[in-house]
Amino acid sequence: MKKIDIKILDPRVGNEFPLPTYATEGSAGLDLRACLDHAVELQPGQTTLLPTGLAIHIGDSALAAVILPRSGLGHKHGIVLGNLVGLIDSDYQGQLMVSVWNRGQQPFTIEPGERIAQMVFVPVVQAEFNLVEDFTDSERGTGGFGHSGRQ
C-alpha cells in the first residue's frame, strides 16, 4: 500500500470526525467529510465550497487524486460536485476543499462531519507529443459522438 502524507488542519478530524478510511477491502475511494462548524443549507441550484479539514501532499508525479461525488447523495438528493470531478495534483499541498452543487429541486442540509465526496488515487502518465502529418488509419477513424449507434 502506498503511503501518502496527510496533514490534519482541524483538530476535530480524528476525534469528532473520523479520518478517511476505506469502508471495505475492495473500496476504491476514501470518504471525505464536511469539516463545518454548523450545518449548511444548500438551496436548489446553489454551489458552495466545503472544507475537509485535511491537506495532502502526494509527492509522487506518477500519482494524482480525484475527488468524486458519493452516489447516494447524487441519486437520492441531487447533490453532486460543482466542478463534476476534482483533480488533486501530486505537488498540491493545500487543504482539500469540495465544491458541492444542489442540482435537485429541494433544499438540502449538510451537517458537520457528513460524508460529502470520495477521493480515489489514480496513476498518471505524462505524455510527450510526437508531431505527425497524418495518423495511421484505424477502423474507427474520425467517427465519434454516437457514430456506432445505440443498440
UniProtKB/Swiss-Prot annotation:
<dbReference type="InterPro" id="IPR029054">
    <property type="entry name" value="dUTPase-like"/>
</dbReference>
<dbReference type="InterPro" id="IPR008181">
    <property type="entry name" value="dUTPase"/>
</dbReference>
<dbReference type="GO" id="GO:0004170">
    <property type="term" value="F:dUTP diphosphatase activity"/>
</dbReference>
<feature type="binding site">
    <location>
        <begin position="70"/>
        <end position="72"/>
    </location>
    <ligand>
        <name>substrate</name>
    </ligand>
</feature>
<feature type="binding site">
    <location>
        <begin position="87"/>
        <end position="89"/>
    </location>
    <ligand>
        <name>substrate</name>
    </ligand>
</feature>
<feature type="binding site">
    <location>
        <position position="83"/>
    </location>
    <ligand>
        <name>substrate</name>
    </ligand>
</feature>
<dbReference type="InterPro" id="IPR036157">
    <property type="entry name" value="dUTPase-like_sf"/>
</dbReference>
<dbReference type="GO" id="GO:0046081">
    <property type="term" value="P:dUTP catabolic process"/>
</dbReference>
<dbReference type="GO" id="GO:0006226">
    <property type="term" value="P:dUMP biosynthetic process"/>
</dbReference>
<keyword id="KW-0460">Magnesium</keyword>
<keyword id="KW-0378">Hydrolase</keyword>
<feature type="binding site">
    <location>
        <position position="97"/>
    </location>
    <ligand>
        <name>substrate</name>
    </ligand>
</feature>
<keyword id="KW-0479">Metal-binding</keyword>
<protein>
    <recommendedName>
        <fullName>Deoxyuridine 5'-triphosphate nucleotidohydrolase</fullName>
        <ecNumber>3.6.1.23</ecNumber>
    </recommendedName>
</protein>
<comment type="similarity">
    <text>Belongs to the dUTPase family.</text>
</comment>
<dbReference type="InterPro" id="IPR033704">
    <property type="entry name" value="dUTPase_trimeric"/>
</dbReference>
<dbReference type="Pfam" id="PF00692">
    <property type="entry name" value="dUTPase"/>
</dbReference>
<dbReference type="GO" id="GO:0000287">
    <property type="term" value="F:magnesium ion binding"/>
</dbReference>
<keyword id="KW-0546">Nucleotide metabolism</keyword>
<comment type="function">
    <text>This enzyme is involved in nucleotide metabolism: it produces dUMP, the immediate precursor of thymidine nucleotides and it decreases the intracellular concentration of dUTP so that uracil cannot be incorporated into DNA.</text>
</comment>
<comment type="pathway">
    <text>Pyrimidine metabolism; dUMP biosynthesis; dUMP from dCTP (dUTP route): step 2/2.</text>
</comment>
